[in-house]
Each structure stands twice: as structure tokens, then as C-alpha cells.
Amino acid sequence: MTILNHTLGFPRVGLRRELKKAQESYWAGNSTREELLTVGRELRARHWDQQKQAGIDLLPVGDFAWYDHVLTTSLLLGNVPPRHQNKDGSVDIDTLFRIGRGRAPTGEPAAAAEMTKWFNTNYHYMVPEFVKGQQFKLTWTQLLEEVDEALALSHNVKPVLLGPVTYLWLGKVKGEQFDRLSLLNDILPVYQQVLAELAKRGIEWVQIDEPALVLELPQAWLDAYKPAYDALQGQVKLLLTTYFEGVTPNLDTITALPVQGLHVDLVHGKDDVVELHKRLPSDWLLSAGLINGRNVWRADLTEKYAQIKDIVGKRDLWVASSCSLLHSPIDLSVETRLDAEVKSWFAFALQKCHELALLRDALNSGDTAALAEWSAPIQARRHSTRVHNPAVEKRLAAITAQDSQRANVYEVRAEAQRARFKLPAWPTTTIGSFPQTTEIRTLRLDFKKGNLDANNYRTGIAEHIKQAIVEQERLGLDVLVHGEAERNDMVEYFGEHLDGFVFTQNGWVQSYGSRCVKPPIVIGDISRPAPITVEWAKYAQSLTDKPVKGMLTGPVTILCWSFPREDVSRETIAKQIALALRDEVADLEAAGIGIIQIDEPALREGLPLRRSDWDAYLQWGVEAFRINAAVAKDDTQIHTHMCYCEFNDIMDSIAALDADVITIETSRSDMELLESFEEFDYPNEIGPGVYDIHSPNVPSVEWIEALLKKAAKRIPAERLWVNPDCGLKTRGWPETRAALANMVQAAQNLRRG
């Protein structure tokens, strides 16, 4: 029984973000479709070859996506919303981009599909839309074409396909309500057709991803798996693939399925390998997800070996990444500026492939010397002085309940804030960032590379902040922001100014479409050596009589959007960040900043996948926010912002944050998110986003007014704010000016009644 290895997927964007650059060039009309397709082909060929060279036996094919793999699956099934369809009914790459972005080089612009987080990761997928009586057919053969490409290159191919039940679970019904699970029988023939095509090509194994099987699914959804897989059996061997949690609670459902293998995440799940081995059918292959696909830490391979060795030789076994390596940067070897000791603690996607090769070889041979050698640096880290800061640990231990309480209740604070700011009804503001123009990015890059001295850099940033204030005053906004010209990223910026974080040069991971992020890495205890945002906030406030918001990223979001340590709890990391940022709130307040926004867009996405684990997480997540904010005086208005959220099931926790104002992303969901706030009788102020910043389309005054009137039916008008869905960093100035002008006009119209 020779053990093989495989990965569940590989990063798509390219080491130098080649895919991002090609996409954006094509969207801007600066390159042809054929040039874009060529970049995709080159990246796929390179990535397959890199995995093969690193020692991977079975290469994932079908993990590449032009925007998002769930959207690719929608096109595969012919699930294209009517507003995005080509007039002749055909499907092409621009169809895909219209669903994702709302527009493409061809076809009519239309509202983009809703976007939300992929399980509890920082990757986003485009939510499939389902309507009653919908028909499905195989229309987009990208998977088959890529399999042909890989076969032509003589690779050992393992196609990757998002499973039918998870696909339906991830979608939403549009229009007349019905049970989307009823569409299962309509999509299965397309899956059968795809599997038949793969069988024709001589494919032995197909990785069919059903991550919904790690959730606490309703019984009807669990019951759907057996008939679905009865329909799919027989053409190729199916590796039923789960990740992000364990499968033990749903194992009875899984073992009844006619598949030939199961992949389990042995990093994030609590499944016991020996117990799994006992309960799985004896002829099934077990794919053991031992290498963390979601983090950047070098694995202790001696531990991984010990975790799996008891079942070696007792059944067919593969070793694998826990999930797709999509969530990890590509290659550590190009990081030339990392300190050697710190660098020795990390492994990126290619290094993780090497770990899988080492593990496979040791399990096949019984020789563990190479594992011990590989694991030595991560074992040495446990005693490093870079990791532990006694002062931080002491302050954390001394936190009391009082540290997370504002001095007075919201009603008392609201009165003090009204007296201080004297804002009109329907007050207008933005979420924080303004367009990051080429000039701004060049300025920051030149400074970073040493081509620009500190004085000239500061003068340049000050000019952009001044311009942002002038633009906002001209537009007539009520509460201003400084525009964040000095910030590369809302998390990276804070990480750069806090001790306990390190940064990479090329550690990019895909967030959605062409958007990539370079998450900071938490390597040790976190503290704030000096004020971070005070100087620029103070400067911006000196330019205007209107209030300017101080802008902070909240502790849970910094945690969720960083690569965390694995040796302490997430709660510990969040509270260390909260204490550091608490000092920032006090300093902003002392500098005369009266409105401070603490963004927590990631609060909901940090939720554990199983509801039974939610309460503990929400308790410390809310406490971290409150520790951060509670130092503020009554007449300091604390705002928070949240994105892509379903709030109804966590409204208690949203209210418990006790922010004076919450702004939320609602435009893509047509204000339906406000139902939660209405039903809960949310007591504080709220700014429902009135237009989608992910799309370049400019909303009309009438459209915004209609949304606000809809909002006022649910929330008393005197507690409503008017704002976009999110920050405007990724937009251009022309559409930003036009959209904000319409937003301000809509608010003014409503004030006049």
C-alpha cells in the first residue's frame, strides 16, 4: 500500500500577481481576451509543474478560476442570472465577469451578484442565484479544457469539482420563495455528464468538494447526500472532500455514500484518525489533510507523522493539505527581507508541497530523520524571545469587567453627542478610504523603496489628505474622513505599527476576483510602541470645521485578516490587539477627534462553522471590541462598520458591541439585512449602505432615495445615517464623485421631505 500525496488546490494568481494584472488590463480595455486567456494557460502550466517538481503525486486540475470557483461552477451548470446573459444565450468569459463585477468589456452592465465569505476564510465567492423552475445544462467547459491541457502535459491529473449539495447550500433563492434543495435532481444530470466526460479521458479519481458536510446541516440536507451520490456513482472514483472542520458528527451520513474515498481536515477538525479508520468502509481510501492549507507556519512533521502512523498499512492512504493552498502565499524562497530566524518558522504553498513529499517518503520508508531536521526550527521557536513579552502578558491578565464598559448607557451618550456635533437629519458620511490613485500608490512605493525621503513623502500624503477633505466639503458630506492615503491595507497598516507582527514582500493571497491581500503574520505578543493614526487624523481635522472620523481597524478583524500564531488562542491574540488599540482611542480623543470608527467587518466571518461553538467566540469577540472602545468619553461617538453580513443570528452580539453608530453593507441585498435590526429593535444608530462600492456603476438619486425610504420603514429616520456600503479605495475618482454627489442629494431631498 504505497502512500501518495496531493494538494486540494493551488494559488491561482501567480507569484507576481500575474493573473490580477492580466484581468485588470483586460477589463480596462488595454489587452485582448486572447492575451488574458494566454496568461491563464501559462499560470496553470507553471503551477502544475511547480507542484510536480516539489514532489506532488496527484495534481489538482479545475482549481483555477477567472474570478471564483463557485462562479465557475455556476457557469458550468448554465446558471446565469437573466440580467447577465448574452442576447444569443451563449456563455463566455465576459458573462462570468458581468456576474462578478456588474460589467465586462462586452454586454450590458447590470448589478453584480452578491458576494460573501467562503466558509470561515478570507476568500469570497459569488453567491449562486436560484429561481423556481430553473433549467440547468452544461454550458461552460472550462474544467474539461483544463483537464485536456494537463493531460497534454503528461501530468497525473485529479480533477476538482464543487459538489452538488454544497453548491446548492451556498446559493440563494431570488424572486418567489421555494426550497432550493428541490433543484438537486435538476443539476445532477449535468454532474453526470461532466463525470462521463472525465471518464472518457481516462481519469481515475475526481476530488468532489462537499465542505457543507462539516456544518450542522438541517436533516433534509443531510438526507439529500445519499440520492445525490447514488446518481453520481460508477463513472470514476470519487474522493469526497471536506475541509475547515471535522466530519465525525456527520460520519453516519458520509459512510452510507457510494464513494471510494474521503478527505478530512486533520488540522482544523478534531477527528481522531484511529476512530475514523474504524468507522470508514475498509475499502475506502482515506486522504489525511495534515498540512495546514490556511496558514504560513512550517509544520512540525514529527507530530504529523505520529498523528497518522497508527493506520499506515491498514488501508489505502494519501497525505494532503488540509484544504486548498489557495489560502496560502505561493513561495517563501522569494522573501529576501525576512529575518533568517523568523523565516525558518514559515512554509508557503510550495514549501507545503515539499512537506507533503517529506511526509509521504517517511511514511513509506519508516525513516523519520528528514522530518526531525525539517521540524527543528519550529520546535526552537517555542523558546524564542521574539515570541514572548512579559509586560503584554501581565496587562492581559489584569483586565477587569470595568475595562469593557463605557461610562454611561447609549441614551446618555447620544444626548452628549447631539449637543457636541449638531448634525442634520439623515447625516451623510463615507466608510473611510478614498480612491487609491496611481499617484498615491507610487508615492508609497517610492518611499518604501527609498527613492523618496520622509519629508517629501509626508508632504505628498498631506496633499492627498487635504484634497480628500476639499472634495468632501465640496460634495456637502456631514462627517468627513481623511481618506487613508497613507494606508496600503486596513490591516497591514496597523500590523506595521504594532510589535508582534511581521510582513512579507510577496505573500499575496486572493480575496476575490482580482483583489489580493498580503496578510500580516502574528509571530509574538502584540503591543503598540507609539501612536499610529493620531498625527494624520489631527492634521485632517485642522483643515475643516466639520467632524473628521478617526479610523481604526478592530481587534477581531486584524486577527481574522492576519495569519495568526498557532501556539496561543485566538482570544488571546484579539485581546492583546484590543489593549494596544485602546491606547490609540485615548490618544485620538486627547487630540480632539470626536468620532472614532472601529471597523469590525470580520466579526461574523470569524464565527466557528458549527453553531454550538458560536457563543464562546462571540463572547470574547465582543469583549475585545469593548475593551478597545470603552476608554472613550460620553461625547466621543464610536462607529463600527461591518461588511457582507447576515446579522439576524448574531443580533444580540451586534447590540452588545454598544457602538453608537453601526454602518453595514446592505445595497446588494436590497436592504433585506435591515429586517434583523427591525425585528431585534436595535437601539442605536445605523447607516445602511446605499450603494455597492464593488461595482463601478453609479447609482441614481432616485435609486438611493428609494433605498433610504425602504430603510426608514424599518428603522426610525432619526436614527439613520447615509453612507456607501464600504470604503472607496478600489474605485476611481470620477465614479466616486458622481455616486457621492447623488447620495448627498438624496439625503438633502429626504430632509426637505
From Swiss-Prot:
Q: Where is the signal peptide?
A: none
Known catalytic reactions: 5-methyltetrahydropteroyltri-L-glutamate + L-homocysteine = tetrahydropteroyltri-L-glutamate + L-methionine
Asked if Repeat is a keyword of the record, the answer is: yes
Q: What class of enzyme is it?
A: transferase
Q: Which Gene3D superfamilies match?
A: 3.20.20.210
GO molecular function, one example? 5-methyltetrahydropteroyltriglutamate-homocysteine S-methyltransferase activity
This molecule's function is given as: Catalyzes the transfer of a methyl group from 5-methyltetrahydrofolate to homocysteine resulting in methionine formation.
Write down what this protein is called.
5-methyltetrahydropteroyltriglutamate--homocysteine methyltransferase
Provide the gene name from the record.
metE
